[in-house]
């Protein structure tokens, strides 16, 4: 999968730069999200891995997407088909979404807690993270009762483990060393 990510990066960057230039970031995001779902479809995946001609594959892919693709989106599909890169479309969308979030100064944050967080707790966590990360934060909260207490917060590469389970593990590691 990392190969597809590497392949997708320049396409995602080009699509992102074009979308920013044309002030169509939302439109391109929706269009690429749709194409990623089409590419993930089992039957489409089988077709894309077949040895069909690039033009035929692009034609079929564009036909399946229908009006969800504008002319520029169709051109992207044609170029990717010519280069044998249609399987990288889901990775292209993922990278595009990351670029979009960076551009909009937003970040998705996963908050895992031992119990359901109150609205006040969510608000406090959100505001503290916005200050620390200097970005608009979108919290995605879930409950994992095995934490015993506390929370684990993941925002990109940042991981804050303030769970009772995490603290017990760190204590155990310290005692064993």
UniProtKB/Swiss-Prot annotation:
SUPFAM superfamilies: N-terminal domain of the delta subunit of the F1F0-ATP synthase. Belongs to the ATPase delta chain family. F(1)F(0) ATP synthase produces ATP from ADP in the presence of a proton or sodium gradient. F-type ATPases consist of two structural domains, F(1) containing the extramembraneous catalytic core and F(0) containing the membrane proton channel, linked together by a central stalk and a peripheral stalk. During catalysis, ATP synthesis in the catalytic domain of F(1) is coupled via a rotary mechanism of the central stalk subunits to proton translocation. This protein is part of the stalk that links CF(0) to CF(1). It either transmits conformational changes from CF(0) to CF(1) or is implicated in proton conduction. The keyword Cytoplasm does not apply. PANTHER family: ATP SYNTHASE DELTA CHAIN. It holds the Pfam family OSCP. It is found in: Cell inner membrane. Keywords: ATP synthesis, Cell inner membrane, Cell membrane, CF(1), Hydrogen ion transport, Ion transport, Membrane, Transport. F-type ATPases have 2 components, F(1) - the catalytic core - and F(0) - the membrane proton channel. F(1) has five subunits: alpha(3), beta(3), gamma(1), delta(1), epsilon(1). F(0) has three main subunits: a(1), b(2) and c(10-14). The alpha and beta chains form an alternating ring which encloses part of the gamma chain. F(1) is attached to F(0) by a central stalk formed by the gamma and epsilon chains, while a peripheral stalk is formed by the delta and b chains. This is ATP synthase subunit delta. Its main location: membrane. One of its GO terms (molecular function) is proton-transporting ATP synthase activity, rotational mechanism. It comes from Vibrio cholerae serotype O1 (strain ATCC 39315 / El Tor Inaba N16961).
């Amino acid at each position: 999968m990392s190969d597809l990510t590497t392949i997708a990066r320049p396409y995602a960057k080009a699509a992102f730069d074009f979308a920013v230039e044309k002030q169509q970031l939302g439109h391109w995001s929706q269009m690429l999200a749709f194409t990623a779902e089409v590419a993930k479809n089992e039957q489409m995946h089988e077709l894309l891995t077949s040895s069909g001609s690039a033009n035929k594959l692009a034609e079929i892919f564009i036909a399946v997407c229908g009006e969800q693709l504008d002319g520029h989106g169709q051109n992207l599909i044609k170029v990717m088909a010519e280069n044998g890169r249609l399987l990288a479309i889901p990775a292209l969308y993922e990278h595009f979404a990351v670029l979009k979030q960076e551009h909009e100064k937003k970040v998705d944050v996963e908050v895992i807690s031992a119990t359901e967080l109150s609205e006040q707790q969510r608000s406090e966590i959100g505001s503290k993270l916005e200050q620390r990360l200097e970005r608009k934060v979108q919290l995605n909260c879930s409950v994992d009762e095995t934490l015993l207490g506390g929370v684990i917060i993941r925002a990109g590469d940042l991981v804050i483990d303030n769970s009772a389970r995490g603290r017990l593990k760190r204590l155990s590691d310290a005692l064993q060393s």
